[in-house]
Amino acid sequence: MKNNSAQKIIDSIKQILSIYKIDFDPSFGAVLTDDNDLDYQMLIEKTQEKIQELDKRSQEILQQTGMTREQMEVFANNPDNFSPEEWRALETIRSSCNEYKKETEELIKEVTQDISHTSGKSPTPKAKSSSPKKSKKKNWIPL
């Protein structure tokens, strides 16, 4: 999935990590940008592992701070809680991730359309069930 938005995400992550003097794992960038015969199953598994690891870390942070997820989200969306440099880095990674998400959604849409065209089947919308239901009468006085 070699594209510009993937590189922007990598650069944004590097920017955030450099603020806290954390080394960047170059294999992460290679996985996002390398277009050679990828084992997509392995890529999905590694992504799921990272998501689980991040979720575990976020749960630990929430326990340590005594905040709920919603409270943490409000905190993270307030620029007053960060230095200007940190806030710029966060905004950059948010926009890069949103751009990457849009490109990925478009790619998935194209692939699913290609698959449906090659299989000869077109996606059919589900028919709405129109079961006759009696509505309750308003201002009805039961006898």
Swiss-Prot record:
Stretches the record annotates as Disordered: 111-143
Family, as annotated: Belongs to the chlamydial CPn_0742/CT_635/TC_0003 family.
Skewed-composition ranges (Low complexity): 119-130
Name listed for the protein in its UniProt record: Uncharacterized protein TC_0003
Biased composition (Basic residues): 131-143
